[in-house]
Amino acid sequence: MPVDPFVHLHVHTEYSMLDGAAKVGALFAEAQRLEMPAVGMTDHGNMFGADEFYQQAKKTGIKPIIGIEAYLAPGSRFHKKPVFWGEAKQRGTDEYGEGGDVSGAGAYTHMTMLARNATGLRNLFTLSSRASMEGQYRKPRMDRELVAEYAEGIIATTGCPSGEVQTRLRLRQFDEAMQAASDYKDIFGAENFFLELMDHGLPIERSVREGLLKIAKELGLKPVATNDSHYVTADQAESHGALLCVQSGKTLNDESRFKFDGDGYYLKSAAEMREYWDKEVPGAADNTLLIAERVESYEDVWSFQDRMPRVTDGSGKTERQLLEAEVEQYLPTRYPEGATQECLDRIKVELDVLDTKGYCAYFLVVGDLTRWAKSQGIHVGPGRGSAAGSLLAYILHITNLDPLEHGLIFERFLNPERDSPPDIDLDFDDRRRDEVLQYAIDKYGRDKVAQVITFGKIKTKAAIKDSARVHHGQPGFAIADKISKALPPPIAAKDIPLSGIVDPQHERYAEAAEVRNLIETDPSVSQIFDTARGLEGLIRNAGVHACAVILSSQPLMGTVPLWARDDGSIITGWDYPSCEAIGLLKMDFLGLSNLTILGDALKMVKANHDREIDLSNLGLDDAKTYELLARGESLGVFQLEGGGMRELLKRMQPTEFADIVACNALYRPGPMEVNAHNDYADRKNGKKPVEPIHPDLDEPLKDILSETYGLIVYQEQIMAIAQKVAGYSLGRADILRRAMGKKKKEVLDQEFEGFQAGMREQGFRDEAIDKLWATVLPFAGYAFNKSHAAGYALVAYWTAYLKANYPAEYMAALLTSNGDNKDKMAVYLAECRRMGVKVLSPDVNDSLNDFTAVGSDIRFGLSAVRNVGSNVVASIAKVREDKGRYSSFTDFLDKSETVACNKRVIESLIKAGAFDSLGHTRMSLAQHHEAAVDAVIGLKRQQALGQFDLFGGGDDAGGEESSSPLAHLQFTPDEWPRKQMLSYEREMLGLYVSAHPLDGAERLLAPYQDTGIAELVGGEREAGKDQVKIAGMISGIQRRINKNGHPWAIVTLEDLDASVEVLFFPKSYEMFADCLVEDTAIAVKGRINEREGTISIFASDAVPVDISAAETDPGTSPAFVIKVPASRVDRSLVAELKRTLQAHSGTVPVHVKLQGPRGVTRLALSSDYFVSTENGLQGELKGLLGAGCFETVL
């Protein structure tokens, strides 16, 4: 017998974060299976899921009923204190197992609200947004005043047992419950307000039912049956319980954990719902159909409208006319000698396209933002993405590359055949990005500008970890780690989904055999895995997109849901694709750290050299810059610092800007797979001939391919080829380019027909056509956007220019930018040593907050010292400026403000060496600083009361220092042993600065290593090599016990340049535990392990290394052997090698091994070329000859 339908109106999806476990797609799939005509969505306090819910409904044909389970303040939404309605004895937990008074500890009640039409949905957007902005107190709360203002188009119910009416009934306040229901009846209308009934087997639900039905009868209201659905199917109850434990931090066996009492919190079938409700409360289930029938289409909410901000000057000019006026205004700033006809023609073409597409306002807005930022001294990137191909963007100072000069194509950015909107990403100094955002808010309206939401999801490994914790608590992490390590390695930073592990149809199923074996043999793993599958992919939290900003011509309130963060920033409740789909303008305001580095470096250049460098007008022909790149010394240079990239630069020997652009485009997996990067380098340097694709195409394609030596490197080249030989428009050519990139055979076959016909019309033979198509097709899959490559190449050139010409200033800025990354700091400090730039310890007289260039040296910033906050640094610098440099330690204490006279701060500064220049040893100051600070603080307090002068009181302030209570302190010349001093320095700075315990020990460690740690962690190891030998000093040991009771250890091993973790598992730990002593040198052999971009070593062998000879007898050095491929030997290399050796003159003999096809020839150099292996020799040799170019022979 057919069952009447039922519509679920109280449904929580995963957007009820860490409370709802129903994925929207799965929810609709189940609703389809159950043949439901409609389904509702009522997430807790937000409408973030409305767009996904609506789109899924359209796909399935199920009617969407979009709503919210709202939080209502018990009084005013502006009142942010608990409110209780009952007697004190009714609070806490009542006989039904829930709080007997207002929920949320007196903060809110609940109400279910459903949008009846588009107006109602917009009103729900507004209500939820204002609740977040104005009513946030534990939850985002509305109040009756707000609900009454926006009640139009909304159907409401009394909600769950925590609703206002139910709460009053629980408190035995029937009159108040009746009054509340009457008030809401008046607000929404009798036909739009229902009494909501639930039953999950809880006494609290049934205890209020009689009162609700009585109120319904007396007020003429209808009851409606709902199920408080939080997951899709009954078998997901356990996963939902685990999700609640993730939210609360509890475990499943914790009796105090938050859990759902009762059962049935899933999408029940119509039969299940009607079987109960048709008997208990006839008509309650039918009313779900009544509500569903009354809900109208929301289509208008999702209709696309041009919501781009409008621009006017009040004169009545069109936006095109305003744009033309700006072009005319700024054209002379770009072409002071006058624009060419080519330039003027292109301006018109671009203006016409923008006007036709309706994007003139967009360019006016973007131009305004970038020019304002530049006027405020905020460094702006030269352009990224295809926007750099626009001449108008260049003229308006949006970008900084002349597309005519660099061969960049506007049609790659926008063309008449292209439907997608233009997208100009803006890079700003990352410390000042927020200023640009605030300007946009001030200019275009706080109600029309918002940042964009993102959703953090529970990914594969996090799901495993969460599941392990909720089942086993802290000990579960060991099991989670075991499972995670058994997973196949991630591809493109994505792990195999848990479903793929057990799905034979999944493409990576075969790789997951180890995980399946664990699941089959270990019940704990099986349990964790099953729960993790239920957690994986659910939304964990909401965040803010790193760069996306929405701008609108109309208020965003009511257009999309909004969310107010604790800091007051307004965020869209939908992600940016959803916002763009309804016509909102999305822009990217990116914070680029390299622009901050450039800005800091330029300030120091101005201060130290009195030179104002305007990067926008910097020539691209600086010889020192290209020489630096050709030597591969690009560590710290934007986009060019990786080990492989440095090798490519040395092979390429760049001589012009186009080479840097090509490097950016070629050093990627696609081109490298076909060796295009090396082909470019070899063709450029004459090692390989430049061959035409086909003889018939040599002349036609010469202008297009000559800059890349006959190779197709850029997407723009594919477009230009189609235009030149097939007669395509550039817009049509862009469609061809995109089709080629997608590689769909049926599409490609169709495109080839048009391409072939076009070439035949141009007179080309089929042989040439087929050869060109066969050549272009694979290249199209990885050809790069030249505009983007050129924009980033310009930033790369700027950073390389400063490193080559102002090394101290640039490296100081680079160190400041990476102050929070100790691994990178170590690498860059090593690079400073290689460059001959000395990094000086922090100093209370010379240091500022950040690293600063002092002559040709760099001074450490005081903010890098542990326990020294920015307020202390500011105080030290201000006092120094107001009262003069500190002449002694006591002078420092005398002059300093109380904030800097703190024992912990002073001790940290002493250990970091910040007082070294004042004449006392660190050890002596450490012995006396506490007594000195006590004396000074006491006197400063008295002085603040007008009682004493620090050094003697009264008018005798200039008297003898012997009258000072500090005069009795006896500072001795004793100093800590070097090892201890360096240990303290590292403790305070995170790094060794004044010296390194391994200084002079390179020659002693060299026989035990085949690679340096910096090369290892920087990815410069040989391809396919998984075994490595390294040597260094142990700077940290974490000793652990595994679940079987066996000890193991994680050892931090560092050399002069970098550090890496070495794992000694139980077997190797047992063999080598005696070698594992902090601050001792050790050599390790092991297997390279790389997970999520982090390198570690699994040790298989270890041996202690005696480096005492580094200090006691440097004259007994073994020979230092330099390996040189014979094929590379020429006069310039020999001259550079001589210069390098003589620059590091010392006592270590040098041998040269010439490696040729017929064997190795060893040459012993004369004593004129003996070296010191300290202070950067090895780094310079690597820069000249490549990694692995030296060894030591005893």
Swiss-Prot record:
Family, as annotated: Belongs to the DNA polymerase type-C family. DnaE subfamily.
Gene3D superfamilies with a match to the protein in the record: 1.10.150.870, Bacterial DNA polymerase III alpha subunit, thumb domain, Metal-dependent hydrolases
PANTHER family in UniProt: DNA POLYMERASE III SUBUNIT ALPHA
Described purpose of this protein according to its UniProt entry: DNA polymerase III is a complex, multichain enzyme responsible for most of the replicative synthesis in bacteria. This DNA polymerase also exhibits 3' to 5' exonuclease activity. The alpha chain is the DNA polymerase.
Chief location: cytoplasm
Catalytic activity: DNA(n) + a 2'-deoxyribonucleoside 5'-triphosphate = DNA(n+1) + diphosphate
Subunit structure: DNA polymerase III contains a core (composed of alpha, epsilon and theta chains) that associates with a tau subunit. This core dimerizes to form the PolIII' complex. PolIII' associates with the gamma complex (composed of gamma, delta, delta', psi and chi chains) and with the beta chain to form the complete DNA polymerase III complex.
GO cellular component: cytoplasm
Gene expressing this chain: dnaE
Annotated localization: Cytoplasm
Keyword Coiled coil set for record: no
Name this protein carries in UniProt: DNA polymerase III subunit alpha
Principal EC category: transferase
Keywords: Cytoplasm, DNA replication, DNA-directed DNA polymerase, Nucleotidyltransferase, Transferase
Residue ranges flagged as DNA-binding region: 1028-1102
GO molecular function, one term: 3'-5' exonuclease activity
Annotated EC: 2.7.7.7
Gene Ontology biological process terms, A to Z: DNA replication
